[in-house]
Regions:
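Acidic, surface-exposed loops and disordered segments
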Residues: 1-359
């Protein structure tokens, strides 16, 4: 299936101007970095990351097993990718201070069998002469757009920047504007979504993650707020609570027609391929993906990831046989549509205090 002081948290758009003016090379605090990085995207907005501050330049990254997906992500591959995204956001946030965040050690793979908050990696904050090219203000602007796009193809400059960034991590970036390919991917995504919904364990897992009203979304500050998904809360709740009613007849046709209408104007499909064998690979995927998503944000473009086309075996086999990937040693691990739309709704995030583990 398919993160600053309180003032910044409350009014991020009013604070962006100040973020570019940091010139001091004093060491930033971990709290400062987390206040920015908490806006990083995570799978289903679960935000499994927690941080224990050890010293000014060392922190431990933990994951909360209650924020994993035993059904949809049993090996926690995409959770690990999300941890990589979070780490890169920490590093980008440190850039204006003349610092970056590196991984000192990965301790153990993320496991759905864990029963307590578990140590994943040790992080270090180090000074660097390298200039961070990505402006951290983009972290607050980034969104996922699941609505209709305006029909424009992804800008060539954006594509060139993404190709260059992917290569830095040993990954390949591909895209297609071929209508046949675009239609194939969108249709396959729709078929896979409805196939996944036939699984009761999948439906039950998702039902716990959906926030069917703004009140729920604001209270939990995590999960899938239906407004961000482009569906009404009442409709989505009906689908998950009364699933059989939506499996046949006019309701099924109506649901599919409505879902497909949200893909109008899609003209570019993109995908990444790279090494995808272990935690180190998945973290690298996340760090690269984080940077490229922010590059697209800098170019005023949005994306909508199609996670189910990777996690669903049948769909993935069709993707592998259809999409370009000349290097057999690399795996297509991320597919998404990219383009231009109205500014999407921002989902909520856990507070910095909820992420930091008190010692």
């Amino acid at each position: 299936m398919n993160g600053f002081s309180f003032t910044v948290l409350s009014y991020p758009s009013q604070q962006l101007w100040s973020l570019n003016k940091i010139t001091s090379l004093t060491t930033p605090s971990w709290r400062e970095l987390i206040e920015v990085a908490r806006w990083a995207p995570t799978i289903h907005n679960l935000q499994p990351h927690q941080v224990k501050i050890i010293s000014d330049n060392e922190a431990e990254l933990f994951y909360n097993p209650e924020r994993l997906l035993p059904v949809e992500d049993p090996e926690s591959i995409f959770t690990t990718i999300a941890l990589g995204v979070f780490i890169e956001h920490l590093s980008i946030a440190a850039g204006p201070f003349g610092y970056k965040v590196i991984i000192d050690r990965i301790h153990n793979p993320v496991s759905t069998q864990s029963t307590k908050t578990t140590l994943f990696a040790t992080l270090r904050l180090i000074s660097t002469l390298e200039k961070e090219e990505i402006n951290k203000s983009l972290i607050f602007e980034r969104r996922t757009s699941r609505t209709d796009y305006n029909g424009e193809s992804l800008n060539k400059n954006t594509i060139q920047r993404m190709e260059k960034e992917a290569r830095k991590f040993g990954h390949d970036f591909f895209y297609s504007e071929n209508k046949e390919i675009v239609d194939f991917v969108i249709k396959l995504n729709e078929e896979t979504l409805f196939e996944d919904l036939t699984s009761k364990p999948t439906r039950d897992e998702l039902d716990k993650l959906f926030r069917y009203s703004k009140k729920e979304a604001k209270n939990y500050k995590d999960g899938l707020w239906t407004k961000c998904m482009g569906f009404s809360g009442a409709l989505t709740k009906s689908i998950f609570k009364n699933y059989k009613r939506w499996t046949k007849g006019f309701r099924k046709k109506l649901l599919k027609k409505y879902y497909m209408s949200t893909f109008k104007g899609t003209s570019t499909i993109c995908w990444f391929a790279g090494q995808f064998n272990n935690s180190e690979d998945w973290i690298k995927c996340g760090r690269m993906f984080a940077r490229n998503w922010l590059i697209m944000t800098d170019e005023n473009a949005y994306i909508h990831p199609f996670g189910s086309l990777i996690t669903n075996v049948n769909a993935n086999n069709k993707i592998v046989s259809r999409l370009t990937n000349p290097d057999n040693s690399k795996k297509i691990w991320m597919i998404f549509r990219a383009g231009y739309s109205k500014i999407p709704i921002r989902s909520f995030r856990l507070s910095t205090n909820q992420i930091i583990i008190k010692v």
